[in-house]
């Protein structure tokens, strides 16, 4: 997802590199792309339980899906979603950059996510013009705007972002 040595805000407790997995349908019915972000409370990424099954389902319907394996666990001493938000913005830009070579429409990209991924979906959709990180290469000149968003049981959305019920 990131060029070597250029990933922003790397944390020592984050145990893997973020990456994308493209799911290409055998019989495409659209040139649109669905980006998928799994949940896991920003403590882990439930990729196998949430992103993968949805990607396979969309492929059966003829739609290309791209699953994002974002950084976990959450950063130490910072906002729980920061690393994941950076990875989501970068993922959208990477998908947009690669779409034409794959015969897909770079202006028809949506995002969906579950739980913490639903929160990340809302962050990506409503903060596309707010950079989550400083540009690292040419890809970051591309917009990370989206054409649709599907937050599915988004965590933290109706609270102050705390891990416990909102008391304010």
Q: Which residue stretches match the model-derived regions?
A:
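N-terminal cap/lid segment of alpha/beta-hydrolase-fold proteins
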Residues: 1-32, 157-164
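Extracellular/periplasmic catalytic domains that process cell-envelope and extracellular macromolecules
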Residues: 14, 27-29, 60, 104, ...
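Short beta-strand element of the alpha/beta-hydrolase
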Residues: 30-40
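A fold-wide structural signal in alpha/beta-hydrolase
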Residues: 33, 59-69, 110, 148
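Alpha/beta-hydrolase active-site loop signature
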Residues: 41, 70-74, 156-157
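Serine-hydrolase catalytic-loop signature spanning alpha/beta hydrolases and amidase-signature enzymes
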Residues: 41-43, 65
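Catalytic nucleophile-loop/oxyanion-hole region of alpha/beta-hydrolase
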Residues: 46-48, 53-55, 68-106
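Primarily recognizes the serine-hydrolase "nucleophile elbow" in alpha/beta-hydrolase
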Residues: 90-167
